[in-house]
Structure formats: C-alpha cells, structure tokens
A protein has these predicted regions:
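Proline-enriched interdomain boundary motifs that mark the N-terminal boundary
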Residues: 3-11, 134-142
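Structural beta-strand segments of beta-rich domains
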Residues: 18-22, 150-154
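Solvent-exposed loop/turn segments flanking beta-strands in beta-repeat/beta-sandwich domains
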Residues: 25-67, 157-186
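Surface-exposed, short loops/turns at beta-strand junctions within beta-sandwich domains
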Residues: 71-72, 82-84, 89, 95-105, ...
C-alpha cells in the first residue's frame, strides 16, 4: 500500500543521465537489510529468470549460492557481504550506481533479511528515473590514427566543449547490437563508467 507502510525510507540523490546515489534508512534500526540498484529491465529479468516466478529475492539467493560455491561458504554466509545496518548512503560509501541507461526507469531494491536468509520485511522497490541527455549541436570529426590489434587510436575534433563519448568496438561485437537496435544499452551495460 502506502509509503507510510514501507519498512525503509529510500531517497535517491545526485541523479544524472547515467548515475545515481541513494540513502536508505530502516524504520526499525534492528533490521539487517540488503539494497541494490538496477535498471527496470534488469529488475524484471531478475524477477522472472529461472524458476523465480516474480520473486526477486530468489535472484539474490541464486547469486549468494554461486558466490558461496566459489568461496566454500553457504549462501547464508554470503549475505554478510551485502548486508547493511542503520542508515546507508551510497555516496559516502563510494558506491555510486554507474553505467545506468539514461532517461530510463531504475529500481532501488531494499529488503530486510536475517543472517540465516529469512526475509523479514516486504521487498520494497523505489523507482527513480535517470535524466534525459541534453541535445548538443557539437560536430565531432573522428580520425583513425592507428588500426592494430588491441591498439586502435582515434582522435576527435569537436566544435564545442560539450561532453561526448567515443567507444571503439569490434564489428563482431557491435554488429548484432546495431542490428537489434540496442547498441547504446549494450555499451552502457558493458561496465564502462560514462559518468564523467
């Protein structure tokens, strides 16, 4: 129902086209919780992957199981690496969410969970929308200087000081995304930080 019933107060801040920070304060200071931000598309994937049947918590359990298998721990022991207590500020923790798709819905997922893996609050989702890019009349002329294996050098001559991105990819990697129309989404989800 109502925001007053939510177990956490979640506020987004420093929202840009591709980044955001957030502050989470549990209404019960004794609750250990996990918070994760992702795009709405990814959230929907997490809810519906495998046998999750709409339960995003199962995505986290699957992740913790995989990590536990790698490090010789149970999935419940893995929770401590993600768990928070008290007020959490992603900016203060140097954990700004980056590489988000611009002008798109993002979700801050927050839930209380015990060290034994028992869900103790409803899963709270807080929607935030990243900003739309500001159109630019910047004219960019690219010149290929070096075209060698793992050594591609390009110079860019620009007509103004507006920010821009140059991202060199092999045709083999990019062609499928160009054809499917999701090139920008693929580039942003590649792990490259475009916040500056």
């Amino acid at each position: 129902g109502k925001t007053a019933d939510d177990p956490f107060v979640v506020n987004a801040k420093n929202v840009t086209t591709t980044t955001l920070d957030y502050v989470v304060t549990p209404k019960d200071d004794n609750v250990q919780y996990v918070v994760q931000t992702t795009g709405m598309d990814m959230y929907n994937t997490w809810c519906n992957e495998g046998e999750n049947n709409g339960d995003v918590f199962q995505h986290f359990v699957t992740f913790w199981k995989a990590m536990g298998n790698m490090y010789g721990e149970t999935w419940q022991q893995q929770i401590k690496y993600d768990a928070k207590k008290g007020t959490y500020d992603s900016e203060v923790d140097y954990n700004t969410q980056k590489t988000l798709l611009w002008d798109a819905d993002q979700v801050i997922i927050t839930f209380g969970v015990t060290k034994d893996g028992e869900l103790v609050t409803p899963i709270q989702t807080t929607k935030v929308r990243t900003l739309a890019p500001v159109p630019s009349d910047n004219k960019i002329k690219l010149t290929l200087k070096t075209n060698a294996w793992r050594n591609v050098v390009i110079t860019a001559d620009v007509s103004n000081s507006d920010k821009y991105i140059v991202n060199v990819q092999s045709a083999a990697a990019a062609d499928a995304h160009i054809q499917s129309g999701d090139l920008v989404k693929w580039l942003l989800n590649s792990g490259t930080d475009y916040s500056n």
